[in-house]
A protein has these predicted regions:
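Acidic, glycine-enriched active-site microenvironments
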Residues: 24-28, 67-70, 280-281
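Active-site ligand-binding patch in enzyme domains
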Residues: 143-144, 149, 153-278
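Short, structured interface segments
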Residues: 128-145
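Short, basic/aromatic recognition patches
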Residues: 3-23, 144
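Zn2+-dependent cytidine deaminase-like catalytic core
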Residues: 32-133, 217, 262
């Protein structure tokens, strides 16, 4: 079990290399081990591209060793055709004798089907290795699948005496180091949301300027569409969702999502954003 945990931790390290690029898919890493030596490894690099198991197997130089090897992967191999072929089939085709898994995939298209397919074809399967750590690693994915909503992150800065800004005014209170950290976090999440007053006071850009990576989608709550249209969030530089009670539709990169005033606000916002395939939001 100790060796299983060692190799699973390597899967975690690899999986994290895909953060910010694989949503709505989970972060997955895989290693191929032969006689207690890693002979291949890979991770899911980008949504729509090959999965971790495919990349790990492809990296093995001597394919003859695969039939005597164990593959470690932090999520149950898929068993369905999506944007890529099923990974469980690839493991079977290469006659890999054992597959060690961290978490079962709760996506209804898999949901134990990958494990069953492997076992039915003579592959030994061990699951549940570092299960809790794996759940935390892919907490966004598991929240999406189980609760049908984005994973929500609350971010705020405050002064030592407990204030977040002068009354009615905006402005930075965090330092340059924290600016870099905040922008790094933005690259890893699907969207960032602010309210009416934040747009008025701060005129934020809600993009990534102090770090290298993708811009998140912007989400703005503008109840009756009264925000000035010269604000940065409406500059069409990135996809922006405008939550409101007036209209639906799209104007260039600005997407209007109409809410129902009779329904609970938070619940319908999360449902609407989930429908837009937003899996995590700050």
């Amino acid at each position: 079990m100790q060796d299983h945990e060692k190799y699973m931790r390597r899967c975690f390290d690899l999986a994290l290399m895909g953060r910010g690029n694989v949503s709505p898919n989970p972060k997955v890493g895989a290693v191929v081990v032969h006689q207690d030596k890693i002979i291949g490894e890979g991770y899911h690099k980008k949504y729509g591209q090959s999965h971790a198991e495919v990349n790990a197997i492809a990296s093995v130089e001597n394919k003859n060793l695969l039939k005597e090897s164990t593959i470690y992967v932090n999520l149950e191999p898929c068993c369905h055709w999506g944007k890529t072929p099923p990974c469980a089939n690839l493991i079977i085709e290469n006659k890999i004798k054992r597959c060690v898994i961290c978490n079962k995939d709760i996506n209804p298209k898999v949901f134990g089907g990958g494990i069953k397919l492997l076992q039915d074809n003579g592959v030994e399967v061990i699951s549940g290795v570092l299960e809790e750590e794996g759940l935390y690693l892919n907490r966004r994915f598991f929240t999406n699948q189980s609760q049908k909503r984005p994973y929500v992150i609350l971010k705020f800065a405050q002064t030592l005496d407990g204030f977040i800004s002068p009354e009615g005014k905006g402005g930075w209170i965090s330092n340059d180091t924290m600016k870099v950290w905040v922008h790094k976090q933005r690259t890893e999440e699907d969207a960032i949301m602010v309210g009416y007053n934040t747009v008025l006071a701060d005129n934020p850009q809600l993009n990534v300027r102090h770090y290298s990576g993708r811009n998140p989608k912007r989400v703005v709550y503008d109840k009756y569409l009264t925000l000035p249209k010269d604000k940065n969030v409406f500059d069409n530089s990135q996809e922006t969702y405008i939550l409101n009670y007036v209209k639906e539709g799209r104007e260039e990169n600005n997407i209007f999502i109409k809410l129902n005033e009779e329904l609970p606000f938070a619940k319908q916002v999360l449902e609407k954003l989930y429908e837009q395939k937003i899996c995590s939001i700050v």
